[in-house]
Each structure stands twice: as structure tokens, then as C-alpha cells.
Amino acid sequence: MSRNTRINALLLLAVAALAVLPLVLGLGDHKEEPFAGADAEAETAITEIEPDYEPWFSPLHEPPSGEVESALFALQAALGAGVLAYYFGLRRGRRQGEERASAASGAAAAPGDAPEGD
């Protein structure tokens, strides 16, 4: 097993552990919504500190249900991941193309390859 394969396997296991451990350990069981978003957590904290607080901004679009909101968030995350993957793939492809071009030009310019005249 190569070094890169081991690193990739360890990273995959770490990501899986981060996803599964909160569920297995029951983190958040004491809450009504165990895995609420940051917005809901912030709203709860603000109303505990200042019960009369009035928000100065409201969302432009309020999704009809939590499922639709989750689907839109997942779509946004997928699009972001696609953009990042495209960028890193493009960068890697360009680097590999430059390496191949320099290797090809280096092989063509090698003095031992030139035919000798009599």
C-alpha cells in the first residue's frame, strides 16, 4: 500500500468518525432539536440574553419546510464542492501538462538522440 493510499484511507476514516461519533455517543440527546443549525442556536442565545430583542433583518426567502431548507443547503454544499473539485482538477491537469511538455522537450533536445553525420 503506497503512502498516498494510506493517507487517503486515514482521512476517510477520520471523516467517517466525525460523522458517526456524534450519533453513536448521543450528543445532543438532551435538546429538543439535537442537531440544530447555527442560526437557531444564535437565536436561542440572543433571546436568553435579551428577551425583547427585535431582529432588524428578515430573510428574502423563507423555505416552506425544514426539508426544503435542508435540500437547498445540500444543493449549495454540492455546488461548492463541485467548484472546488473543478478548480483543483484543472490545476492538477495544468501542472501535469507542463511536466509532460517539459519532459518531451527535454527528451527532444537530448544530445545523444541527434543523428551524427559522417
Curated annotation (Swiss-Prot):
Keywords: Cell membrane, Cobalamin biosynthesis, Cobalt, Cobalt transport, Ion transport, Membrane, Transmembrane, Transmembrane helix, Transport. Residues 102-118 have a biased composition (Low complexity). Pfam families: CbiN. One of its GO terms (biological process) is cobalamin biosynthetic process. Its main location: membrane. Residues 99-118 are annotated as: Disordered. Pathway: Cofactor biosynthesis; adenosylcobalamin biosynthesis. The chain crosses the membrane at residues 7-27, 70-90. Belongs to the CbiN family. Forms an energy-coupling factor (ECF) transporter complex composed of an ATP-binding protein (A component, CbiO), a transmembrane protein (T component, CbiQ) and 2 possible substrate-capture proteins (S components, CbiM and CbiN) of unknown stoichimetry. This is Cobalt transport protein CbiN.
